[in-house]
Amino acid sequence: MPGWFKKAWYGLASLLSFSSFILIIVALVVPHWLSGKILCQTGVDLVNATDRELVKFIGDIYYGLFRGCKVRQCGLGGRQSQFTIFPHLVKELNAGLHVMILLLLFLALALALVSMGFAILNMIQVPYRAVSGPGGICLWNVLAGGVVALAIASFVAAVKFHDLTERIANFQEKLFQFVVVEEQYEESFWICVASASAHAANLVVVAISQIPLPEIKTKIEEATVTAEDILY
């Protein structure tokens, strides 16, 4: 059986892995990966708008991996519309990259549960195989954190190099052309970053759990026999 010191740290490692699992689920469900400002370029060109009038043509957009919302401002007031990524919008995006992001996050969910299971196993007993011990916990956390980091990097690539926001903003727009003037990563994106950070923190936790505690030795007093004791 592991000592109380290791049990405490392995328990913390299992909680961190479980928190990563929950964070990824939240990031998948909440449609707030990125928000931005979109300019109705067609409206600006039609009225030859000045700099002061541009604010009348700037709308808002936010989206996640499955759905989002857009507010069109084309000089006639804001018009809000909801949209879903699947099944039609994804065809206008880099579909392979978008699906890869989802698959990576689903894989990260499984790896987070595996790393949690290994931490619980080490908390209950001392595994007889090295791969099931602290090294195994580190391995699964490296894999889980790496997969989440790869999903984050893929999303950033889709935004920066594949004009993700602009493609979404112009989906099913036949009369108006929208241009992205501002982009900002939102809470779901940073939740994913926190998930990867939880696995990185687990590596530190496992390393701390291997620090040997100093043994507390009790000093045994030796019995002294005097001449008076012998006489008695």
From Swiss-Prot:
Coiled-coil intervals, chain numbering: none
Source species: Homo sapiens (Human)
Name of the molecule in the record: Clarin-2
Membrane topology annotation: Multi-pass membrane protein
UniProt KW Phosphoprotein keyword: no
Membrane-crossing residue ranges in chain numbering: 10-30, 101-121, 139-159, 188-208
Illness: Deafness, autosomal recessive, 117: A form of non-syndromic deafness characterized by prelingual, moderate-to-profound sensorineural hearing loss. Sensorineural hearing loss results from damage to the neural receptors of the inner ear, the nerve pathways to the brain, or the area of the brain that receives sound information.
UniProt GO BP: auditory receptor cell stereocilium organization; sensory perception of sound; stereocilium maintenance
Compartments, record wording: Cell projection, Stereocilium membrane
Function: Plays a key role to hearing function. Required for normal organization and maintenance of the stereocilia bundle and for mechano-electrical transduction.
Family under the similarity heading: Belongs to the clarin family.
Glycosylation sites: N48
GO cellular component terms, semicolon-separated: stereocilium bundle; stereocilium membrane
Lineage of the organism: Eukaryota, Metazoa, Chordata, Craniata, Vertebrata
Keywords: Cell membrane, Cell projection, Deafness, Disease variant, Glycoprotein, Hearing, Membrane, Non-syndromic deafness, Transmembrane, Transmembrane helix
Presence of keyword Mitochondrion: no
